Structures are given as structure tokens and as C-alpha cells.
């Protein structure tokens, strides 16, 4: 495949880590956020990969902690007039596309995603134009502009089922942007899939040799893997799935020790689900030159207590998500198709 933009060779500048807060500062911001949420008629919608203290705050204030599909559902149905989306930018955009009448706030609008960055809309449009006979399916981890070009949007929790459905209709697929997830879905369904070559900087760093050594050290452990991981890591898994599916697998598997190959932010909810089980991080070869993300998305880490308080307190463009209305209407079509399809799966 030849594209103008090569995600494999792209180096994304990582944001600086937030300044650590003292115990007193954390307590101050937690109480301030709780008060501001009530004053703004706002609710928190947080992703599993945000830091534990952010997820805990969402729980305590009646918010949502979930994968991107459930975040979209929850935000669209909740009566609050303001959604505080703790995650990365495409999640805030998706919330605005589905709920244009609501105010969508984010702790920072600079929280990117390597999959989103790795799929620039101009190059992606050219790629799609070169293959006009293919149905365009894009992962939720994309910009509003890329979604607007798609026929379908999909999350990892329903990717296999959707592609299996489209394949049964004889459709050939363009899949973007995650090459590992695309390869996994193709292997599961046998579909005719042409993949864009993006990757998640967290999951792409899991190392087979290091995971093998950890498995040898803990032979009684089950391995849970997100399908954004390289094929060699997926092949070692006892369970493969989206964040919500991995939490469900943790409960179902009989093993008392679990090696988890996804962003370590998931440990907060997974440990709640299996309090008596031991959770181990799958290795990325450790902190230092051999890994950049080291099993935690640096942009998810930008969602801090101080920035959440600022988003709720300060009106204006520094925190509010805006999506062009014509673009929003186009992106809404494949998003609604995803939600309708997901609803049929739920029965």
C-alpha cells in the first residue's frame, strides 16, 4: 500500500506529564469539581484509560466509566446539559456529534490519540478515492472529518460482528486506522479488508519476548490482550477483546492471576470486578528508551483534577468542543449506523 502519510514512520511529540498534586490539593480539587458539576448541570464521562483518581471521581458523581461505545451511548442519553469528557479529543468530538445541543467540555483539547494523528483526513480521502468500490469502515479513534468520510464507524467491542455482517453481504472493506485491529478482524472474519497502517502507541509496544518471560515466571496466569496489540501478542492470549470485554473475561476466567496487555488505566475497574485476583501488567520492556508510552497513554494522562476543575469553571474555547455543523451531520450518519447495529446485537 502506498500513501502520502506513513504512520509507521511518524514520531508523535508526547505531552508533558501533569504536575503532581499534593494530598491537600487533590482533596481541594475533588470538592471543587463536585460543586461545579452540580452548578453546571454537568456529568462526567470518563474512559477506562484515564487515571484511577479520575475514574473514582466519575463514579462518586454519578458519571460513566466505560469504553468509547458506552461513553457515546451514555452521553447521548443522559439528561445533563453539559458533558465533561475525560479522555482524548476524538471522544469529545464524538459526544458533540451525537449531542449537538449539549455543551461538551474536556480537561484539555490537546489530548490527542496516535491512531487519530496517524490518519490525516486529506491522505485518507485520497486513499478512499483510490478504492471507490470498497465500503469505508473507520475505528472510533478518528477525527470527526475522517468519520464524515466513512460509511461505518466501529469500536473494538463490535468490530468482528460488523465486518462479519458486511462480509456476508459481499462487501469489500477499507479499514482504518489501526493495522493490528484490522488484521485481527480480518483473521476472525475472513473478510476482504484493505488496511490503513496506523497503530496505537500503547498497544504497539507490548513485547513478545518479555511477555514470554513473564508467562514463564507465572505459568498459572491467563493472558488478556486488546486486539490493537501486534499479532504475536494476540496469538499468546487466553482472551482477546475490547476494554469492556477484557473486564468481563477477567470475571469469567478461572485463573487467579491475570497478565493484562492494554493500557494500565483499565486496572481500576478490572480490580473492582475481580478484587481477589492478582493483575499484572504485560511488559513493554519497562520505563526508558525501549518504550515511549510504557503501557499508559500520555494523552489520557493529561486528564487531571486541576484541568477538570478549570474546564468546568472557565467558559470558552480552551475547553469546549466545537464541530462544524455540516461536518457533524455527515459524521453522524456512520455513527448512528454503529449505534443501531450495536443495539441489534444487544437484542
Curated annotation (Swiss-Prot):
GO MF term (any one): quinolinate synthetase A activity
Cofactor remark: Binds 1 [4Fe-4S] cluster per subunit.
Main localization category: cytoplasm
Gene Ontology BP annotations: 'de novo' NAD biosynthetic process from L-aspartate
UniProt keyword annotation of S-adenosyl-L-methionine present: no
Keyword Secreted included in the entry's annotation: no
GO cellular component assignments: cytosol
Cellular compartments annotated: Cytoplasm
Named cofactor requirement(s): [4Fe-4S] cluster
InterPro entries: NadA, NadA_sf, Quinolinate_synth_A_type1
Disulfide bonds: none
Origin: domain of life: Bacteria
Binding site for iminosuccinate: 47, 68, 139-141, 156, 226-228, 243
Swiss-Prot/TrEMBL keywords: 4Fe-4S, Cytoplasm, Iron, Iron-sulfur, Metal-binding, Pyridine nucleotide biosynthesis, Transferase
Pathway in which the depicted protein is active: Cofactor biosynthesis; NAD(+) biosynthesis; quinolinate from iminoaspartate: step 1/1
Alphabetical list of Pfam families matching this protein: NadA (PF02445)
EC identifiers of the protein: 2.5.1.72
Binding site for [4Fe-4S] cluster: 113, 200, 297
HAMAP family for this protein: NadA_type1
Function per UniProt: Catalyzes the condensation of iminoaspartate with dihydroxyacetone phosphate to form quinolinate.
The protein's name: Quinolinate synthase
Gene assigned in the entry: nadA
Amino acid at each position: 500500500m502506498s500513501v502520502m502519510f506513513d504512520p509507521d514512520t511518524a514520531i508523535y511529540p508526547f505531552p508533558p506529564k501533569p504536575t503532581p498534586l499534593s494530598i491537600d490539593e487533590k482533596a481541594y480539587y475533588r470538592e471543587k469539581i463536585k460543586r461545579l458539576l452540580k452548578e453546571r448541570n454537568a456529568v462526567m464521562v470518563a474512559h477506562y484509560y484515564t487515571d484511577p483518581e479520575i475514574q473514582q471521581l466519575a463514579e462518586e458523581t454519578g458519571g460513566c466509566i466505560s469504553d468509547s461505545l458506552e461513553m457515546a451511548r451514555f452521553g447521548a442519553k443522559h439528561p445533563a446539559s453539559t458533558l465533561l469528557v475525560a479522555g482524548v479529543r476524538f471522544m469529545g468530538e464524538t459526544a458533540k456529534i451525537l449531542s449537538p445541543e449539549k455543551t461538551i467540555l474536556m480537561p484539555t483539547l490537546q489530548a490527542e490519540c496516535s491512531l487519530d494523528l496517524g490518519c490525516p483526513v486529506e491522505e485518507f480521502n485520497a486513499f478512499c478515492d483510490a478504492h471507490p468500490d470498497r465500503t469505508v469502515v473507520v475505528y472510533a479513534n478518528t477525527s470527526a472529518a475522517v468519520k464524515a468520510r466513512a460509511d461505518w464507524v466501529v469500536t473494538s467491542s463490535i468490530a468482528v460482528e460488523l465486518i462479519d455482517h458486511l462480509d456476508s453481504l459481499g462487501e469489500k472493506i477499507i479499514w482504518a486506522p489501526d493495522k493490528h485491529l484490522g488484521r485481527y478482524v480480518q483473521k476472525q472474519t475472513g473478510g476482504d479488508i484493505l488496511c490503513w497502517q496506523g497503530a496505537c502507541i500503547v498497544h504497539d509496544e507490548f513485547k513478545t519476548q518479555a511477555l514470554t518471560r513473564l508467562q514463564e515466571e507465572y505459568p498459572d496466569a491467563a493472558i488478556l490482550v486488546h486486539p490493537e496489540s501486534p499479532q504475536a501478542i494476540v496469538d499468546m492470549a487466553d482472551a482477546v477483546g475490547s476494554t469492556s470485554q477484557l473486564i468481563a473475561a477477567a470475571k469469567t476466567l478461572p485463573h487467579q492471576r491475570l497478565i493484562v496487555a492494554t493500557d494500565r488505566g483499565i486496572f481500576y475497574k478490572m480490580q473492582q470486578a475481580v478484587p481477589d485476583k492478582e493483575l499484572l501488567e504485560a511488559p513493554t520492556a519497562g520505563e526508558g528508551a525501549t518504550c515511549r508510552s510504557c503501557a499508559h497513554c500520555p494523552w489520557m494522562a493529561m486528564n487531571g483534577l486541576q484541568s477538570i476543575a478549570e474546564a468546568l469553571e472557565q467558559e470558552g474555547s480552551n475547553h469546549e468542543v466545537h464541530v462544524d455543523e455540516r461536518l457533524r451531520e455527515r459524521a453522524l450518519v456512520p455513527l448512528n449506523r454503529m449505534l443501531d447495529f450495536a443495539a441489534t446485537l444487544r437484542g
